């Protein structure tokens, strides 16, 4: 759904004012009713989501039945937060809102009826509604319309396993490996020491037993006298 302003010979500023007034009336009393005969409009997805710090795209397209003027002066603008919200981008100036400085890219050229608005370094404060506005000159005068529903952007939380630093994961596995190696190494050394001690004890016992047996035999030997 889109709201159209048609002003033969009028200025874009006047078109902007009438657009706001007409939209206010539409929202106040007739927002639920649609005109099946409309052959113009702006298409935007109902909602898009992205990861914090990444980029997010809002695709758009528009259509109209009129014949373009020799110099159509076609331009694209974007608002945010609500239908009457502040402009964040205007291709005809060009203009970029302070909040989005260095973070907006409009992939669209004159004559095209579709494009993509890309927001870089997506932030939590970017979560709101975005509305595409189209302005052009036709043989019937100025035509100026804007998407009514807009597109809602939301932040998607990434899974913890993907958000954790590889260095931290590697460190944990390395630490666990060292502890595991240490736990395996110390018992081995202790077992080896115990085995040596037991072996020495057995040798001492054997020597004592054999020595005692030799002593007894020597004691029991008949006296040669």
From Swiss-Prot:
Give the membrane topology.
Answer: Single-pass type I membrane protein
What are the record keywords, sorted? Glycoprotein, Membrane, Signal, Transmembrane, Transmembrane helix
Q: Show which residues sit on the Extracellular side of the membrane.
A: 32-195
Keyword match Transmembrane = yes
Under which name does UniProt file this protein?
Answer: Paired immunoglobulin-like type 2 receptor beta-2
The terms describing its cellular component in GO are: cell periphery; membrane
Domain of life per record: Eukaryota
Q: What InterPro entries does its record include?
A: Ig-like_dom_sf (IPR036179), Ig-like_fold (IPR013783), Immunoregulatory_rcpt-like (IPR051694)
Q: Where located?
A: Membrane
This chain's source organism reads Mus musculus
- Gene3D superfamilies, per this entry? Immunoglobulins (2.60.40.10)
Primary location group: membrane
The gene that this protein is the product of is Pilrb2
């Amino acid at each position: 759904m889109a709201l159209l302003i048609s002003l033969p010979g009028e200025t874009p500023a006047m078109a902007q004012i009438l657009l706001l007034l007409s939209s206010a009336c539409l929202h106040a009393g007739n927002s639920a009713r649609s005109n099946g005969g409309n052959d113009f409009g702006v298409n935007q997805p109902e909602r898009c989501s992205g990861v914090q710090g990444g980029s997010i795209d809002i695709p758009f397209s528009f259509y109209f039945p009129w014949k373009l003027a020799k110099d159509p002066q076609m331009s694209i603008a974007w608002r945010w937060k609500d239908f009457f919200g502040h402009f964040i981008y205007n291709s005809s100036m060009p203009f970029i809102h302070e909040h989005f400085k260095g973070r907006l890219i409009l992939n669209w050229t004159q004559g095209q009826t579709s494009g993509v608005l890309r927001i870089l370094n997506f932030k939590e404060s970017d979560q709101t509604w975005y509305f595409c506005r189209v302005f052009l000159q036709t043989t019937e005068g100025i035509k100026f319309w804007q998407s009514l529903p807009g597109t809602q952007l939301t932040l998607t939380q990434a899974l913890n396993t993907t958000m954790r630093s590889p260095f931290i994961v590697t460190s944990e596995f390395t630490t666990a490996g060292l502890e595991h190696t240490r736990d395996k190494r110390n018992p081995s050394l202790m077992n080896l020491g115990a085995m040596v001690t037991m072996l020495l004890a057995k040798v001492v016992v054997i020597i004592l037993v054999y020595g005692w047996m030799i002593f007894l035999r020597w004691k029991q030997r008949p006296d040669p006298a």
